[in-house]
């Protein structure tokens, strides 16, 4: 067969394999195409071009052809083309793109062959010469391979393409979100603080683009991976200095990103204690209290509040933070955004029992919780009712509560009873919350507040409790507590 015959054959095969119904008919030609490509000439010819076209079309949405391609060592054949600095590299990447487009199994094989590194390098070198379809194709290759990446340097390399992505209308967030979902990449970043800082700066220093805020907020996801908390990132002086510089800046996006990072790092008790010794707490509080336009900068304020709330999760630190929770309530209550009301209610809930006197002395703070407990926002209403239940629990379990707390409790007994019933009405998919309400209801009845029992029997909650008692999806201890409550209710 002459060279022209070979060109004609593979051109014909490439054209016909555009038809999904015919692709399987040409499977035997995959080995021949790879054989022609195996000897990579310094200047590929039209024969090579048609072989690439045939492989790309025949492996599109055809698992049997893809299997043949990989079994015949197709990636090893194409890899030298991917590393060449010419237009044929784009055709080789097109074949790879079609082979892995909807196949997770083959993506892992391709990732092991360092194709992601080659794709990014080729994009960097050819970004001013490629046409739009090839940009889209390379972006999909990166997006599909980042979940299998093990080295943060490949993310750093990819971020250097942000100007090209923005210029070509490609959404970088979709691509890099896959990388930050990858625990190996995130641990790699945590072990390389300098590269992490440089990567953040690549995004920060970009002129504004549509997803800039979202892109910056990908970096705190690093600390969402539990494995990262076992690294020394939280103790790295360079990284902590960098976060501090973000708080000192006037850049709202940087402050938000730094707050989210701190919040995710302090999920572990010992890290929270270490970072409490730094000045980050005062930075977070100052950022919130000095904010003149809460609603105009709601993302920044929320991020700071969320970080503070994470500091409060360890029981050992709650007494320290209780005054802060009360201090912030008025500021956050001024917002029209219910997510800020929610986080305020949550911080107050975690501050029990250290603020019972404060709530009794300043009933306007308490009645703000009452208002929130009736909010149409389900999450806000539920969290506020949980906070009211927290007041009851700590009042009834703390020995010798002060008289003013006792008087305050009795004056608002109807509200507390209402909260018990409201929370007990919650769907069983919130077992922890239901458990809290069951426990508080038992406490109230045992302390002589029998009206709770009457309220429960007179409401649909009574039937719900009986269904919880025998629900196989609920924990044994919760069902036992429900049974105890029903006994108390039915014998009043």
UniProtKB/Swiss-Prot annotation:
GO terms for biological process: establishment of cell polarity. The keyword Iron-sulfur does not apply. Keywords: Cytoplasm, Guanine-nucleotide releasing factor, Nucleus. It is found in: Cytoplasm; Nucleus. One of its GO terms (molecular function) is guanyl-nucleotide exchange factor activity. GO terms for cellular component: cytosol; mitotic spindle pole body; nucleus. Probably acts as a GEF (guanine nucleotide exchange factor) for the Rho family of small GTP-binding proteins (G proteins) that stimulates the dissociation of GDP to enable subsequent binding of GTP. May also chaperone the processing and/or trafficking of small GTPases independently of GEF activity. May be involved in the control of polarized cell growth via CDC42-mediated signaling. May also be involved in the control of cell-wall organization via RHO1-mediated signaling. This is GTPase-GDP dissociation stimulator arz1.
């Amino acid at each position: 067969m002459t060279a022209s015959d070979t060109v004609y054959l593979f051109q014909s095969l490439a054209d016909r394999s555009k038809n999904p119904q015919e692709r399987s008919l040409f499977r035997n030609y995959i080995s021949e195409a790879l054989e022609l490509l195996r000897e990579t000439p310094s200047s590929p010819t039209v024969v090579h071009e048609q072989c690439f076209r045939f492989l790309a079309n025949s492996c599109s949405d055809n698992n049997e052809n893809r299997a043949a391609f990989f079994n015949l060592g197709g990636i090893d054949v194409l890899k030298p083309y991917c590393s060449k600095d010419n237009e044929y590299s784009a055709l080789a990447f097109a074949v790879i793109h079609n082979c892995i487009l909807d196949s997770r199994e083959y993506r892992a094989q391709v990732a092991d062959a360092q194709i992601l590194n080659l794709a990014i390098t080729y994009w960097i070198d050819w970004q001013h010469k490629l046409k739009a379809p090839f940009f889209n194709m390379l972006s999909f290759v990166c997006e599909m391979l980042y979940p299998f990446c093990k080295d943060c340097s490949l993310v750093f390399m990819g971020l250097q393409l942000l100007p090209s992505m923005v210029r070509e209308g490609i959404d970088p967030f979709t691509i890099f979100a896959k990388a930050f979902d990858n625990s190996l990449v995130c641990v790699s970043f945590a072990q390389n603080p300098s590269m992490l800082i440089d990567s953040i700066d690549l995004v920060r220093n970009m002129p504004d683009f549509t997803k800039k805020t979202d892109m910056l907020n990908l970096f705190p996801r690093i600390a969402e991976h539990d494995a990262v908390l076992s690294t020394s990132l939280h103790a790295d002086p360079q990284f902590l200095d960098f976060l501090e510089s973000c708080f000192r800046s006037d850049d709202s996006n940087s402050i938000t990103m730094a707050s989210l990072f701190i919040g995710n790092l302090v999920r572990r008790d010992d890290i929270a204690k270490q970072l409490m010794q730094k000045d980050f707490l005062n930075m977070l509080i100052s950022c919130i209290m000095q904010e003149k336009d809460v609603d105009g900068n709601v993302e920044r304020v929320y991020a700071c509040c969320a970080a503070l709330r994470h500091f409060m999760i360890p029981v050992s630190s709650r007494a320290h933070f209780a005054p802060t929770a009360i201090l912030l309530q008025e500021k956050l209550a001024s917002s029209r955004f219910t997510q800020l009301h929610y986080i305020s209610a949550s911080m107050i809930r975690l501050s029990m029992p250290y603020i019972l006197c404060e709530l009794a002395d300043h009933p306007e703070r308490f009645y703000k919780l009452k208002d929130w407990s009736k909010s149409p926002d389900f999450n806000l209403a539920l969290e506020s009712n949980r906070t009211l239940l927290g007041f009851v629990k700590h009042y009834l379990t703390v020995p010798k509560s002060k008289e003013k707390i006792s008087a305050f409790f009795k004056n608002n007994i109807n509200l507390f009873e209402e909260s018990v019933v409201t929370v007990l009405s919650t769907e069983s998919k919130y077992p922890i919350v239901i458990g809290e309400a069951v426990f508080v209801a038992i406490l109230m009845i045992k302390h002589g507040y029998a009206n709770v029992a009457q309220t429960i029997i007179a409401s649909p909650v009574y039937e719900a409790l009986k269904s919880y008692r025998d629900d196989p999806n609920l924990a044994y201890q919760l069902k036992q507590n429900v049974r105890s409550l029903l006994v108390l209710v039915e014998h009043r």
